[in-house]
């Protein structure tokens, strides 16, 4: 009985020490908007990549997300936002910090950047708060 009790206590202690961060309602709303925008690119043959990056942007701040991209593929980086954050910009930088030329889309609380890398490697996607607002955002990306 003591052994069973020790085992139960050990499992309880381990499970209590693991803290999982739950998505907030604002992040869920932002992800919904980002997936809706990314779904529109699906009509052109783009597939949505598993996973997403959510966070909170302060006013006139940015968030960087590291991605590995492959030459010959095309990518769309779609961002949705939640109130009070209404307007964001999306930019792509290479590993040296040079800003890449992208095709941009912006519509209210959604924005996207399209990019086709000439070289495979690590790139950085910047999500920027362009107005004096802060709030939640979510980034998803598509490829073909």
Name every feature range the model reports, one short phrase each.
Residues 8-16:
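Bacterial N-terminal signal peptides
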Residues 23-25, 52-136, 142-144:
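Acidic, Ser/Thr/Pro-rich low-complexity intrinsically disordered segments
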Residues 41-57:
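Glycine-rich phosphate-binding "P-loop"
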């Amino acid at each position: 009985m003591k052994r069973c009790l020790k085992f139960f206590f050990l499992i309880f202690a381990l499970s209590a020490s693991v803290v999982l961060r739950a998505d907030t309602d604002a992040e869920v709303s932002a992800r919904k908007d980002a997936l809706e925008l990314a779904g529109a690119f699906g009509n052109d043959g783009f597939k949505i990549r598993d996973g997403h990056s959510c966070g909170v942007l302060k006013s006139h701040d940015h968030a960087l997300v590291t991605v590995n991209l492959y030459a010959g593929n095309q990518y769309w980086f779609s961002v949705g936002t939640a109130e009070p954050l209404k307007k964001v910009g999306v930019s792509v930088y290479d590993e040296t910090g040079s800003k890449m030329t992208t095709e941009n889309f912006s519509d209210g609380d959604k924005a996207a950047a399209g990019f086709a890398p000439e070289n495979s490697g690590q790139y950085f996607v910047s999500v920027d708060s362009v107005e004096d607002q802060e709030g939640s955002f979510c980034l998803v990306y598509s490829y073909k």
